[in-house]
């Protein structure tokens, strides 16, 4: 991927068909004294289900101390018959700018079960959050919608994302 200001290079790594790592290198434009910047997203699976992602925190995310941010995922009981990707992985840097990767097969094999929740690895006494993914199904158990809501330790919650899922099987 290249723009006028920079060139981005990606390397995707897979284990048994599952995406386990994305490496991004951002090269400055030719003649610039800027350094090459690199980011790595790591994904871990257990029995075909995504259990965690680890990514670099970005400078504007002071809550993570500019280190790594690990998010843990929970698989539900619904089998992922329609091979849907975990939608919120697309919001994890460096994939956050490349959502088309979800459907281009670059994310590798989908999880065995639909993901039902995620949360940061290190909740504190003063701040906790848990994001839940609620799927609606038609009479044939085909997912037709996804509601994402985040609940915070202070008792507040927010539903911030509703997605309609449209699946055509040919």
Predicted ranges, named:
Residues 1-170:
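Buried hydrophobic residues that stabilize the cores of well-folded domains
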């Amino acid at each position: 991927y290249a723009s006028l200001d920079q060139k981005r290079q990606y390397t995707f790594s897979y284990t048994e068909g599952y995406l386990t790592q994305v490496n991004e290198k951002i090269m400055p434009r030719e003649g610039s004294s800027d350094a090459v910047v690199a980011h790595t997203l790591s994904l871990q699976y257990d029995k075909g289900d995504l259990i965690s992602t680890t990514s670099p925190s970005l400078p504007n995310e002071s809550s993570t101390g500019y280190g790594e941010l690990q998010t843990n995922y929970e698989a539900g009981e619904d089998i992922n018959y329609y091979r849907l990707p975990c939608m919120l992985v697309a919001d994890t840097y460096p994939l956050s700018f490349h959502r088309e990767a979800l459907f281009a097969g670059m994310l590798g094999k989908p999880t065995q079960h639909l993901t039902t929740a995620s949360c940061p690895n290190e909740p504190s006494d003063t701040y906790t959050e848990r994001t839940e993914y609620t799927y609606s199904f038609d009479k044939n158990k085909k997912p037709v919608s996804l509601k994402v809501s985040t609940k915070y330790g202070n008792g507040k919650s927010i539903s911030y994302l509703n997605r309609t899922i449209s699946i055509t099987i040919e």
